[in-house]
């Protein structure tokens, strides 16, 4: 039997760390198809912190792609599970036959599916990638992303799967300890990445609430982002008074980030695609409602779980936010499919499907 190989095709430290730790701590002990990884980027201590995994690291996305293609050609029974997919060479290999459809299973992370960049090289590449995506053996994704993908590629198998957000189920009831009143605190974006469209989001928040709310913008990730942080701060201070605007430019440890989220009353996410599911989960767990772009298909996942959804086009005020908080507080968090531990069984199923052991 050939063991499934997992591929992290881009050097995205935060996401790669989450995936590797999840496999090491949760999946590797019970499945031999959860132990082999090929990773773009440096080790950064992963080998030491994930002893249950066999990890091979590659200095560039191209080097990793070449290694994957060589393995795929050497053994056509070898299957790969691609987590996210921001590696141009791998899509081209699928398109050209270097990797066969039956070898290619893909967990969609959101940004790898949507065509949002206006850069010339991306606009030229998107049509090729779209064709290649129709040739994968199967995809795993959120309900909204599955719906989006199926409209383009109805013949490709799709299974529900959620990114393994680090969550403590014991905190599901913790939000009820806090009394919510007074000035609203609004979280804008889930990171410092430009995809959050921070400036447009700040303007939208100001249009809805004026300079009457506290605005928190976490921008400590990714690194080397100071110029953009300064740009966002300048735009924010043109709208909000200094005491109402908090731009966080330092990377935060998980517990500190969790504590920050729990001080908020509302999350505001203007991007028109599925992303930031980890932050959304942690907010929902704390009974903090989220404002989404109507083009972000994750609202379908939230509605399926009977969670209140607010949209950027809604008329928002404190009364609307407090009512959404009340509705969230009435939801039994233990039954939400994209919460831990409920997302575990779909991962076991995904491993068996990608490995060819399940129909």
UniProtKB/Swiss-Prot annotation:
GO terms for cellular component: plasma membrane. It is a peripheral membrane protein. Its main location: membrane. One of its GO terms (molecular function) is fucosyltransferase activity. One of its GO terms (biological process) is enterobacterial common antigen biosynthetic process. The keyword Nucleus does not apply. It catalyses: beta-D-ManNAcA-(1->4)-alpha-D-GlcNAc-di-trans,octa-cis-undecaprenyl diphosphate + dTDP-4-acetamido-4,6-dideoxy-alpha-D-galactose = alpha-D-FucNAc4-(1->4)-beta-D-ManNAcA-(1->4)-D-GlcNAc-undecaprenyl diphosphate + dTDP + H(+). It is an enzyme of class 2 (transferase). Pathway: Bacterial outer membrane biogenesis; enterobacterial common antigen biosynthesis. Keywords: Cell inner membrane, Cell membrane, Glycosyltransferase, Membrane, Transferase. Its EC number is 2.4.1.325. It is found in: Cell inner membrane. Belongs to the glycosyltransferase 56 family. Catalyzes the synthesis of Und-PP-GlcNAc-ManNAcA-Fuc4NAc (Lipid III), the third lipid-linked intermediate involved in ECA synthesis. This is TDP-N-acetylfucosamine:lipid II N-acetylfucosaminyltransferase.
């Amino acid at each position: 039997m050939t063991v499934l190989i997992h591929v992290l095709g881009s050097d995205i430290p935060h996401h790669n760390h989450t995936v590797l730790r999840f496999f090491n701590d949760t999946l590797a002990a019970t499945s031999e198809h959860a132990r082999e990884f090929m990773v773009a980027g440096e080790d950064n201590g992963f080998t030491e912190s994930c002893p249950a995994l066999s990890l091979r690291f590659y200095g560039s996305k191209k080097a990793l792609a070449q290694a994957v293609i060589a393995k795929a050609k050497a053994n056509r029974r070898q299957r790969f599970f691609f987590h996210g997919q921001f590696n141009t060479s791998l899509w081209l290999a699928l398109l050209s036959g270097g990797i066969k459809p039956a070898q290619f299973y893909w967990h969609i992370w959101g940004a790898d599916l949507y065509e949002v960049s206006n850069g010339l090289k991306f606009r030229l590449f998107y049509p090729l990638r779209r064709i290649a995506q129709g040739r994968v053996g199967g995809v795993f994704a959120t309900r909204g992303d599955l719906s989006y993908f199926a409209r383009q590629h109805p013949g490709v198998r799709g299974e529900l799967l959620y990114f393994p957000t680090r969550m403590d189920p014991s905190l599901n009831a913790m939000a009820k300890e806090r009394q919510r009143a007074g000035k609203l605190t609004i979280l804008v974006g889930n990171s410092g990445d430009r995809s959050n469209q921070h400036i447009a989001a700040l303007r939208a928040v100001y249009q809805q609430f004026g300079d009457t709310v506290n605005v928190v913008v976490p921008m400590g990730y990714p690194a080397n982002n100071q110029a953009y942080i300064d740009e966002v701060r300048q735009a924010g201070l043109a709208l909000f008074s200094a005491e109402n605007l908090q731009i966080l430019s330092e990377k935060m440890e998980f517990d500190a980030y969790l504590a920050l989220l729990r001080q908020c009353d509302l999350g505001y996410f203007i991007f028109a695609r599925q992303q930031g599911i980890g932050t959304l989960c942690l907010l929902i767990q704390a009974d903090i409602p989220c404002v989404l772009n109507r083009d972000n298909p994750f609202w379908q996942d939230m509605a399926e779980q009977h969670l209140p959804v607010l949209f950027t086009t809604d008329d928002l005020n404190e009364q609307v936010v407090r009512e959404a908080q009340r509705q969230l507080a009435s939801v039994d968090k233990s039954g939400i499919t994209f919460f831990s531990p409920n997302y575990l069984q779909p991962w076991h199923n995904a491993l068996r499907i990608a490995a060819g052991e399940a129909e």
